[in-house]
Amino acid sequence: MAETAYTPRLRTEYDRKIKSALTEKFGYANVMQVPRLDKVVLNMGIGEAVNDRKKAETAAADLSLIAGQKAVVTYSRVAIATFKLRENQPIGCKVTLRKAKMYEFIDRLINVALPRVRDFRGLNPKSFDGRGNYSLGIKEHIIFPEIDFDKAGESWGMDITVCTTAATDDEARALLTAFNFPFRQ
């Protein structure tokens, strides 16, 4: 028996609808020119980890729960006296998602996590970097359903960067709008 491979809902939607809609809108000659999602990078900067190494490990464990993949603790590269920071001290954690896990995370972000943000009015449509990548910041990581609100000792902010193969911001904005990213009007 041949097993059918699991395909995330957003990937199927991209293959069936979004790809053809973007080709029609921008007039691509080749199917490989159509922008697609490349990766999603989640980053937590933990300033308190300088004094307490356990906080970096706790944040990495929470980020691993959110992402569904092991997070890596990041260390400082240079010493900065004003921040009382020495070289090779833990200062945060990060994880890079690709393929199926990326599509699953984006699905959870759009449909579950962002609606749980207090006073959410939409994402800033100007947060593109000029090369087709979108970045957003979240003030509390406890908006994700994987994090138990009662067991979470602290709530940390996090950065989410969605990297696409789009050449311009307009193409990337059209791609993310097709994925139902709730941009502000």
From Swiss-Prot:
State what this protein does.
Answer: This is one of the proteins that bind and probably mediate the attachment of the 5S RNA into the large ribosomal subunit, where it forms part of the central protuberance. In the 70S ribosome it contacts protein S13 of the 30S subunit (bridge B1b), connecting the 2 subunits; this bridge is implicated in subunit movement. Contacts the P site tRNA; the 5S rRNA and some of its associated proteins might help stabilize positioning of ribosome-bound tRNAs.
Member of which family?
Answer: Belongs to the universal ribosomal protein uL5 family.
Question: What PROSITE patterns does the record tag this protein with?
Answer: RIBOSOMAL_L5 (PS00358)
- Can you tell which superkingdom this protein's organism belongs to? Bacteria
Q: Which organism is it from?
A: Bradyrhizobium sp. (strain BTAi1 / ATCC BAA-1182)
What Pfam family is a match, any one? Ribosomal_L5_C
State the UniProt keywords alphabetically: Ribonucleoprotein, Ribosomal protein, RNA-binding, rRNA-binding, tRNA-binding
Task: Quote the protein name from its UniProt record.
Answer: Large ribosomal subunit protein uL5
